[in-house]
C-alpha cells in the first residue's frame, strides 16, 4: 500500500470518527433537546442527506476539474466552518442550516477521497477501496461509542469534539497531500475506446447505481424501522446497540474471511456483489421469524458479511468504468446513489410499516434485493456488446 493511501486511510478514520460523534445522536438532540417532533427531526436529516447527494456530485466533478487535494480541502473547509458554527450556535433554527451545510461539505469529501484512492494506487484494484471502507467503519464504531459518552456530559462537547477531529483531518490532508499528483492515474476502464463506449459506460454506471440504491435502501432499515421494531418486541436499547458494535468489529477483523470468500468463490467483482446480495437476502429472510435477540444478532452477522462484499465493490467497479478524466464524477455518482438510498430508506420503510406492518416491509425488501442482483448481472451487458462491435469493425477493416 502506497504511503499516500495510508495517509488517506488515517485521515478518513479521523474524519468519520468525528462525524460519528454527532450523526447517531441527531434525532435525540432535535427531539429531546430542541423540543421538535420526530417528523421535524426526520425532515432535518433528509435535508442533510439531500445536501450530501449534491455534495457527492459536486465533489466528483471538482476532482476531475481541480484535482483531489483541492477538492478534499474545499470540502473540509466548508464542513469545518459549519462545525465551528455549531459549537457556538446549536439552537433552532441555526442547527438546521449548519447541519445542512455540513452535509454538503462532507458530501464533497467522500467521492474525492475514493477517486484519490484509485488514483494513488490504481494497480491495487479493490484493495484500495476496501482500505477506505474499513477505515470508515472503524471510525463509525469508535465515534459512535465515544459520542454517547461525551453527550452524557454535555451535547456542547459533542459539537466541540467533532470540530476538533475535523481540524485534525484538515491538517492531515494539508500536510500529507499537497505535493501528491493525482492527474496521471492509469486508465483501468473495461474498454479504452472512450469515444465509442462512453455512453455504454455511463449506462452501466446508472444500472449499477440503481441496484446500489436499493441495497442501501434495504440496509438503512436496520437503523430505522428494524430498530423501532426491536424496541416494540421488548429488546432493550443497549442490546440493540450491541448489534452495531458487532457490525463494526466484524468489518475491521473480518477481512481475512472476505479475502477467503473472494479467492474461493468470487474472483470477479460482479460475482462478489451477487454473493453479497444473496447473503443480504438470507439475513433479511431471518427477520420474518425473528422475535428474540439471538436471531437479530445472527441476522446482523450475516448482513455484515454481505456488506463487506458489496459496499467496497461498487466504487471499485466505478473506477474501472470511468473514462480518463471522469474518475471523480463516477465516484460522485455512486456515492450519491448510496446517500440517496439512505435518504429515502427511512421514509419508504416507515410508510410500509405504518400501513402494513414489518412483515410486508421485509418481503418488499427481499424483492428489491432480487432486483439488485439483476442489475448487477446486467450492468455491463452494453459494454460487452460495444466491445464485440468494435472487434467486428476492426476485423472488417
From Swiss-Prot:
It is a multi-pass membrane protein. Signal peptide: none annotated. InterPro entries: MFS, MFS_dom, MFS_trans_sf, MFS_Transporters. It holds the Pfam family MFS_1. CDD domains: MFS_MdtH_MDR_like. Gene3D superfamilies: MFS general substrate transporter like domains (1.20.1250.20). This is Uncharacterized MFS-type transporter YttB. The lineage of its organism: Bacteria, Bacillati, Bacillota, Bacilli, Bacillales. The gene is yttB.
Amino acid at each position: 500500500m502506497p504511503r499516500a493511501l495510508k495517509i488517506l486511510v488515517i485521515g478518513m478514520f479521523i474524519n468519520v470518527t468525528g462525524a460519528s460523534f454527532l450523526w447517531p445522536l441527531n434525532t435525540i438532540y432535535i427531539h429531546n433537546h430542541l423540543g421538535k417532533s420526530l417528523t421535524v427531526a426526520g425532515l432535518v436529516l433528509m435535508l442533510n442527506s439531500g445536501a450530501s447527494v449534491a455534495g457527492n456530485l459536486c465533489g466528483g466533478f471538482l476532482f476531475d476539474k481541480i484535482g483531489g487535494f483541492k477538492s478534499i480541502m474545499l470540502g473540509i473547509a466548508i464542513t469545518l466552518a459549519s462545525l465551528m458554527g455549531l459549537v457556538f450556535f446549536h439552537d433552532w433554527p441555526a442547527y438546521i442550516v449548519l447541519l445542512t451545510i455540513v452535509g454538503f461539505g462532507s458530501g464533497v469529501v467522500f467521492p474525492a477521497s475514493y477517486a484519490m484512492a484509485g488514483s494513488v494506487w490504481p494497480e491495487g484494484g479493490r484493495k484500495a477501496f476496501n482500505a477506505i471502507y474499513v477505515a470508515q467503519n472503524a471510525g463509525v464504531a469508535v465515534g459512535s461509542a465515544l459520542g454517547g459518552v461525551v453527550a452524557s456530559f454535555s451535547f456542547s462537547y459533542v459539537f466541540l469534539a467533532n470540530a476538533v477531529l475535523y481540524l485534525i483531518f484538515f491538517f492531515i490532508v494539508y500536510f500529507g497531500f499537497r505535493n501528491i499528483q493525482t492527474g496521471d492515474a492509469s486508465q483501468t476502464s473495461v474498454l479504452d475506446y472512450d469515444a465509442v463506449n462512453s455512453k455504454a459506460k455511463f449506462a452501466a454506471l446508472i444500472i449499477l447505481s440503481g441496484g446500489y440504491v436499493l441495497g442501501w435502501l434495504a440496509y438503512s432499515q436496520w437503523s430505522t424501522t428494524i430498530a423501532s421494531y426491536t424496541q416494540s418486541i421488548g429488546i432493550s436499547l443497549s442490546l440493540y446497540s450491541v448489534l452495531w458494535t458487532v457490525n463494526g468489529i466484524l468489518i475491521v477483523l473480518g477481512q481475512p474471511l472476505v479475502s477467503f470468500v473472494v479467492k474461493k468463490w468470487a474472483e470477479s467483482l460482479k460475482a462478489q456483489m451477487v454473493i453479497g446480495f444473496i447473503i443480504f437476502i438470507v439475513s433479511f429472510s431471518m427477520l420474518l421469524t425473528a422475535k428474540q435477540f439471538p436471531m437479530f444478532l445472527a441476522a446482523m452477522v450475516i448482513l455484515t458479511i454481505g456488506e463487506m462484499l458489496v459496499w467496497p465493490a461498487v466504487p471499485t467497479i466505478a473506477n474501472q468504468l470511468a473514462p480518463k478524466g471522469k474518475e471523480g464524477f463516477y465516484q460522485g455518482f455512486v456515492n450519491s446513489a448510496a446517500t440517496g438510498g439512505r435518504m429515502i430508506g427511512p421514509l419508504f420503510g416507515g410508510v410500509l410499516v405504518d400501513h402494513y406492518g414489518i412483515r410486508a416491509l421485509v418481503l418488499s425488501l427481499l424483492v428489491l434485493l432480487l432486483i439488485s442482483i439483476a442489475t448487477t448481472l446486467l450492468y455491463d451487458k452494453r459494454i460487452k456488446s460495444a466491445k464485440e462491435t468494435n472487434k467486428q469493425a476492426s476485423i472488417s477493416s
